[in-house]
From Swiss-Prot:
Catalysed reaction, written as an equation: acetaldehyde + NAD(+) + CoA = acetyl-CoA + NADH + H(+)
Keyword check for Oxidoreductase: yes
Superkingdom of source: Bacteria
Protein name: Acetaldehyde dehydrogenase
Length: 307
């Protein structure tokens, strides 16, 4: 049996708990700790039942055990407000931090766009936001064909899928996503909007992407690029679907997406959780494979090889 890299999950809410199930299926990652602040949280209860060590004392409850339990990677699914301190404390112990908050201390990672370009020595990687993971691949699909003057994304998510941490970070969500639309998506100017939909029954995550190209768009090349990128995202988020588009109106290119989750923790309508946690797991698998096989040529998964 192949050895695995041991991991800790910080945050026992929706994102942390959904991520737990994905890590439990990994060939190269082994979740051994879950950290929370509410001893009654469902996430901690599920983690304990799955055999993980748990603490409700926050990050300080984990620190004394990091070295003994050989934790090499930690996932922070708490809040942008506390991430900097969490990252500092764990980085000092040699742990690489995968940041699922909008804190954006480390470089952005959107797997099909820039996973292969990440610095292998980086100690903090930011997964942007759920809206960013869903939409930035589409902005990048357009910008790799021709220059994008302006990119705007609208992410609509079910209210039931949005926990208190995300609600506290709405401003950070929009700023971080807009920044990544520019830095990773390739738009000269980016804007992000999140809509929390209270509809019952809950709707699937839906995303609209608008790109304004500098020149008249090459419709055939952009359409081919978008379909190619859709296939790359589907390799780790099977429910990532192009519902309409690309639609061309002058220099404006519009793409409509729907994201259905795997239903690991919350039901399938929570595609926003799925795309975030799947992207984080995929990024960590790349890091873990490098740790386990430090050769120049590593093999993470078939999906990563095709990305």
């Amino acid at each position: 049996m192949t050895s695995k890299i041991k991991c800790a999950l910080i945050g026992s809410g929706n994102i942390g708990t959904d991520l737990l199930y994905k890590l439990m299926r990994s060939d190269v990652l082994e979740p051994v700790w879950m950290v929370g602040i509410d001893p009654e949280s469902d996430g901690l209860a599920r983690a304990k039942a799955a055999g993980l060590k748990v603490t409700a004392d926050g990050i300080n409850g984990l620190l004394p055990f990091v070295e003994a339990d050989e934790i090499k990677i930690a996932f922070d699914a708490t809040s942008a407000y506390v991430h900097a301190e969490n990252s500092r404390k764990l980085n000092e112990l040699g742990v690489v931090m995968i940041d699922l908050t909008p804190a954006a201390i480390g470089p952005f990672c959107v797997p099909p766009v820039n996973l292969s370009q990440l610095d292998e020595n980086v100690k903090n990687i930011n997964m942007v936001t759920c809206g960013g993971q869903a939409t930035i691949p589409m902005v990048a699909a357009v910008s790799r064909v021709q220059a994008v003057e302006y990119g705007e994304i609208v992410a609509t998510v079910s209210s039931r899928s949005v926990g208190p941490g995300t609600r506290q970070n709405i401003d950070e969500f929009t700023r971080t996503t807009a920044g990544a639309v520019e830095q990773i998506g390739g738009a000269e100017k980016g804007k992000a909007i999140i809509v929390i939909n209270p509809a019952e029954p809950p709707l699937l995550m839906r995303d609209t992407i608008h790109c304004l190209t500098k020149e008249q768009p090459d419709e055939q090349a952009i359409t081919a690029s978008v379909h190619e990128m859709i296939e790359q995202v589907q390799q780790y988020v099977p429910g990532y679907t192009l519902k309409n588009g690309p639609v061309f109106d002058g220099r404006k290119v519009t793409i409509f997406l729907e994201v259905e989750g795997l239903g690991d923790y919350l039901p399938k309508y929570a595609g926003n959780l799925d795309i975030m946690t799947a992207a984080a797991a995929r990024t960590a698998e790349m890091l873990a494979s490098k740790m386990l096989n430090p050769e120049p040529h590593y093999n993470v998964t078939q999906e990563a090889a095709l990305a």
